[in-house]
Amino acid sequence: MNGRECGTYTIVSQLIWREFFYCMSANNPFYGEMERNPICIDVPWYDIPEQLEAFENGKTGFPFIDAGIRQMRQEGGIHHIVRNALSMFLTRGDLWLNWEPGYELFMNYLIDGDWAVCSGNWMWVSSSAFEKSLNSSFCLDPTVYGWRVDPNGCYVKKYLPELADMPVEYVYSPWKAPLEVRQQ
């Protein structure tokens, strides 16, 4: 069995990313922010407090995103796939809001929060730094991404009890369900 088959490749690649972000943060006290951070580009983010508040409270209306926020707030941890989905949704994927409040939310709730790694990932996913070296040009559709990682909707139903009885074909986009289904 080679390293890729037993997971060694994945572990090593994640360690390399961690070290990359540690190196990039060295001697940069402003690494966890945009404005004074010399490696960040100036992105003209929107400033819509209502959208930020909905995101922070897991009430965006996008079940996979809301489940991720609620899991993080309840348990102090979320899978890296969910972290990336949340980061992309807040920034360049959907809301086009500054990544700094998302970074602060992660650091407040994630028990494994790491200043350099968390900041680095937010900069990467938001495309405010590292774009050429890390190629983060794709975007995730929050209604499709959940299907890819959890086709049965178990994750959403666990963290969004209001959707526990929603038929699986509508769990990631409940607004598409017929009215009689939504009223149940």
Spell out what each predicted region is.
Residues 1-184:
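C-terminal catalytic domain of photolyase/cryptochrome flavoproteins
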